[in-house]
Amino acid sequence: MEQSSLLLKKQLADMRRVPVDGFSAGLVDDNDIYKWEVLVIGPPDTLYEGGFFKAILDFPRDYPQKPPKMKFISEIWHPNIDKEGNVCISILHDPGDDKWGYERPEERWLPVHTVETILLSVISMLTDPNFESPANVDAAKMQRENYAEFKKKVAQCVRRSQEE
């Protein structure tokens, strides 16, 4: 059995044994430890409060040397989530130097990260977006220039997530 699958099984068991507020996780298919379905609960005191946003975590076979990819399958309007649902945060970027110079190496993926640290970073991103490098330029622009419209669009996403 691959080291990565053993590590993922341990991380899943740890999360089930000691759940963390704000999210839950499980396997999409019991026979595939590399594909997880997660539910991110909109953090209190944010525009996303009350939302139940589903996402997929796709782990590479060389995890934890390389980060997983995270994609929301629930619609979510946020500057750091592109229109296809892909999450763009530093710790999900491959380790090493950033060729564009936006991120320091220690901000990027490190093998010490776990599923829990990833999901806590996503919750932090929902609370405090990074406007320096938006994945959804339209959402970032709307939040800056027409906050009322931005709030309305996020509220629609929250409502839809409650109906899924």
From Swiss-Prot:
It comes from the Eukaryota. One of its GO terms (biological process) is proteasome-mediated ubiquitin-dependent protein catabolic process. Keywords: ATP-binding, Nucleotide-binding, Transferase, Ubl conjugation pathway. The active site is at C88. GO terms for molecular function: ATP binding; ubiquitin conjugating enzyme activity. InterPro entries: Ub_conjugating_enzyme, UBQ-conjugat_E2_core, UBQ-conjugating_AS, UBQ-conjugating_enzyme/RWD. Residues 3-163 form the UBC core domain. Its EC number is 2.3.2.23. It is an enzyme of class 2 (transferase). Pathway: Protein modification; protein ubiquitination. SUPFAM superfamilies: UBC-like. Pfam families: UQ_con. The keyword Nucleotide-binding applies. It catalyses: S-ubiquitinyl-[E1 ubiquitin-activating enzyme]-L-cysteine + [E2 ubiquitin-conjugating enzyme]-L-cysteine = [E1 ubiquitin-activating enzyme]-L-cysteine + S-ubiquitinyl-[E2 ubiquitin-conjugating enzyme]-L-cysteine. SMART domains: UBCc (SM00212). Catalyzes the covalent attachment of ubiquitin to other proteins. Belongs to the ubiquitin-conjugating enzyme family. This is Probable ubiquitin-conjugating enzyme E2 7. It comes from Caenorhabditis elegans. The gene is ubc-7.
